[in-house]
Design a protein with these regions (language model features):
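Cationic, histidine-enriched alpha-helical/coil surfaces that engage anionic ligands
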Residues: 1-203
């Protein structure tokens, strides 16, 4: 993604970053549909999750109706890309997982591998169906129109603030949340800490 100037109006900086991420999704969409390489899905998924993190940070910059609709779309895309990506990782690492167990164990586990392949095919089919659907195409097109079109006359109260200080405050807040959750971590809460660490990384 390109760099943004810290003195840029916050809404322009957010739109620039989100437009870069939309480009990443567009570049990886067809390769994901055709299953040319697992990295296409990985790139698409990361861009969708980063878009969600940027939208979450833009509560006083991006109009509420725009942000709400975009977050719904990216949440759906994140949900649909999760299963096939997880199965890609499992199957790409299968040899490394099973080799230490010896050749006999690897043979015994072949039905498990076959099951994972079937599940992978089903997960990709579900994702591909949605990526080619009218809903997905409409969402992507309307999102692109908002990112590149004129700004609305009425904007949230921090939309025209300088980008740098606004983002710096959000990063400090996300870091503080991560540290608080890390200090209070329990066996039941690692997912919360993981999610917060991703928020910091994506910002």
């Amino acid at each position: 993604m390109g760099f943004t100037k810290p003195d840029l109006p916050a809404i322009e900086g957010f739109r620039s970053v989100l437009a870069d991420l939309a480009d990443v999704i567009a570049r990886n969409r067809q390769g994901t549909i055709e299953r040319l390489d697992p990295e296409f899905l990985h790139g698409l998924r990361v861009a969708a999750r980063r878009s969600r993190a940027v939208l979450a940070a833009g509560g006083r910059v991006i109009p509420d109706d725009v942000r709400r609709e975009a977050r719904l779309g990216f949440a759906l895309l994140s949900d649909l890309t999760g299963p096939p990506r997880d199965l890609d990782v499992y199957l790409l690492g299968w040899a490394a997982y099973t080799e230490p167990l010896g050749p006999h164990a690897a043979v015994d586990l072949e039905p498990v591998r076959a099951h994972l392949i079937r599940a992978q095919d089903e997960a990709y089919a579900t994702l591909t169906t949605w990526l080619q659907s009218e809903e997905a195409l409409d969402r992507l097109a309307s999102w692109r129109r908002w990112l590149t079109g004129p700004l609305p006359e009425v904007l949230p109260d921090r939309a025209l603030d300088p980008l740098g200080p606004y983002v710096a405050k959000r990063i400090r807040r996300a870091q503080a949340t991560l540290l608080d959750e890390g200090r209070a971590i329990t066996a039941e809460s690692p997912d919360e800490v993981r999610a917060s660490s991703e928020d910091v990384r994506y910002l």
